[in-house]
Regions:
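Active-site beta->alpha loop and helix N-cap motifs at the rims of alpha/beta catalytic domains
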Residues: 45, 50-72, 76-160, 166-168, ...
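Adenosine-phosphate binding glycine-rich loop
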Residues: 485-552
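Rossmann-like adenosine-cofactor binding region
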Residues: 436-506, 510
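Glycine-rich adenosine-cofactor-binding loop
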Residues: 227, 283-289, 387, 391, ...
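Catalytic alpha/beta core domains of metabolic enzymes, predominantly
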Residues: 148-279
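NAD(P)-binding Rossmann-fold cofactor-contacting core
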Residues: 417-438
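Phosphate/diphosphate ligand-binding glycine-rich loop within oxidoreductases
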Residues: 280-391, 489
Length: 552
């Protein structure tokens, strides 16, 4: 029976020592018999199971670094001190020692990343190793040494360091994800307790490559693996279930120490990384670009509220081929499809409902257990549901502005509900074609002053990028309700003019939430928590508006 790790004085209440423990997968060093077992430090002092999230902490001087750490450590006991960010990192050592005296439960990685490996340290290898050894002496339980640095050291130097702290041997590729197995093989020739391999995802499928390495090798080695960049979000969230010992997070959105790093708050609260396991289902929003999407916030809120073991990610797909390979191999169970793929995805689906076929666009994909892909369009629900809550749709006169994908969803959905639908588009031909297909009526702009409607729906982007623009003039607004599909900004010029004309307005946020709610229902079979979803999006839009105003 394995002996329990030695407890530091004052660590009786250390929460790390009361976690569920499992054997630590320490790398067998094939070319170094002396390192085929955990280092003496690991055996004596390191918790057998580290928290899943390590916060990377930086500072412009030792006081700032340690003050940040003091504010974080209660809720985040696993930290990385980026000593290379300090102009004179040696000055931090007394403060680090004092930090551990006050916070004996903390587990800290000391990192002094060299400039040619994405860090800021420009000193000699000897000074780097000396600093890490002193950081270990001050209390840091783990130290990070780059593979390039290790190749310039004798094995005995690394072994000596391992007597004072657990050694993480790290490799970073800031350009691509390639030959990960070859990289690991090189690393295995040197003494270490953890092997950290970080690449850059240039495709979504690079995450699959990384996670396959973790799944294959984590039983033989203690690995930390993830992909950097916007497209690396999959491995940052799901890598821990593939075998990564932990992942890294930033303190706040502006303090990333690597491209694509997610904040600790988002990893825990939005993506629920502590609960991710083999049974966790994966969903995502797909587009190019997709970084602006509010869908992860709204969908993960709904999944958490309804106790669904699933996670929803933003997937920046540059090609459908890349996306579909991930759907198959991760696997991904459902997708929200955004621009530019709503039409292109159709030919890759095994079946669609008749409504989606009519519209000619798909915004929702379900992956069945047999791997087949089924397409739906929930934009119709996004239009119909808000209106049903306010008026009787049968016989209602509704003007739709636009003839694109969103307009098509509105027109066909409203015709199915018995509405009399009119279509106005800047170019007459698309409006006339849509009118013929849906058995609606196309109108010309001069006709608007003679017509009245129950509802006017703006299904164009006019008023979004340029907030001073409106698709209609004030004297052309002759309706009881004006429904603008644009949800950012929250109030468009069209909506302001409609209020001045005495019309009631329906904000685009309602369409966004209702179409998402319908997606949630299709995927889970559960009623969507509408109120929670609306609240999250409202707050997110307010925060986005405040940030934009602060930059002006």
């Amino acid at each position: 029976m394995r002996a329990s790790p030695k407890v530091f004085p004052g660590d009786r209440d250390n929460p790390l020592l009361h976690l569920e423990l499992r054997p630590c997968n320490i790398a067998p060093i094939r070319s170094q018999p002396m390192s085929s077992s955990p280092s003496s430090f690991v055996q004596r002092f390191l918790p057998l199971r580290l928290p899943r999230v390590c916060l990377a902490v930086t500072g412009s001087d030792p006081s700032e670094l340690l003050e940040k750490a003091e504010g974080l450590v209660r809720d985040n006991p696993f930290l990385e001190f980026r000593l290379d960010y300090l102009p004179r990192p040696g000055l931090a050592l007394p403060k680090i020692k004092r930090f551990f005296e006050l916070n004996p439960h903390a587990v800290v990685i000391a990192t002094c990343r060299r400039a040619n490996n994405g860090g800021k340290f420009k000193g000699t290898v000897a000074s780097q190793l000396d600093l890490l050894a002193k950081a270990a002496g001050a209390g840091c339980q783990l130290v990070d040494v780059e593979l390039q640095t290790a190749t310039k050291c004798r094995p005995e130097q690394l072994q000596k360091l391992r007597t004072r702290a657990a050694l993480i041997l790290s490799f970073h590729d800031f350009h691509a994800t390639k030959k990960l197995d070859v990289t690991l093989e090189k690393m295995c020739g040197r003494p270490a307790d953890f092997f950290k391999i970080v690449s850059t995802a240039t495709t979504l499928y690079d995450n699959v490559v990384m996670m396959r390495l973790l799944e294959k090798e984590s039983d033989r080695h203690s690995l930390v693996g993830l992909c950097m960049g916007e497209q690396g979000i999959i491995s940052r969230v799901l890598g821990v279930r593939a075998g990564s010992a932990f992942t890294f997070a930033s303190v706040s959105p502006g303090e990333q120490t690597a491209p694509g790093q997610v904040t600790a708050q988002d990893l825990r609260s939005v993506y629920r990384i502590e609960q991710v396991d083999a049974a966790t289902r994966v969903y995502g929003v797909v587009g190019d670009p997709v970084s602006h999407s509010l869908s992860p916030a709204i969908m993960n809120t709904a999944l958490r509220r309804e106790n669904v073991n699933a996670v929803y990610l933003a997937l920046h797909a540059k090609t459908l081929k890349d996306l579909l390979a991930c759907v198959r191999d991760i696997p991904i169970h459902g997708l929200s499809i955004t621009m530019p793929y709503k039409q292109a995805i159709l030919e890759h689906l095994d079946n669609t409902d008749s409504h989606t076929t009519k519209i000619g666009a798909c915004n929702t994909v379900v992956r069945a257990q047999d791997g087949k892909l089924y397409g739906f369009n929930t934009d119709t629900a996004g239009v119909v549901r808000p209106l049903e809550q306010r008026i009787t749709l049968e016989g209602a006169r509704i003007l739709v502005l636009g003839a694109g994908g969103a307009a098509r969803a509105a027109v066909f959905g409203l015709k199915e509900r018995g509405c009399e639908v009119f279509i106005l588009n800047r170019s007459a031909a698309p409006a006339q074609k849509l009118a013929r297909q849906a058995k609606a009526r196309s109108v010309k702009r001069p006709d608007l002053r003679k017509l009245s409607f129950d509802v006017i729906i703006n299904a164009t982007p006019v008023g979004m990028a340029n907030t001073r623009e409106s698709p209609l003039n004030e004297n052309e607004i002759n309706a009881r309700y004006v429904f603008d599909m644009i949800y950012d900004p929250a109030e468009t010029r069209l909506m302001k003019m409609a209020k001045e004309r005495g019309a009631q307005v329906i904000p685009g946020i309602e369409m966004f939430v209702q179409q998402a709610a319908r997606q949630f229902e299709i995927w889970t079979g559960k009623p969507a928590p509408w109120d929670d979803m609306l609240r999250v999006v409202t707050i997110a839009l307010q925060e986005r508006a405040a940030k934009a105003a602060a930059k002006k």
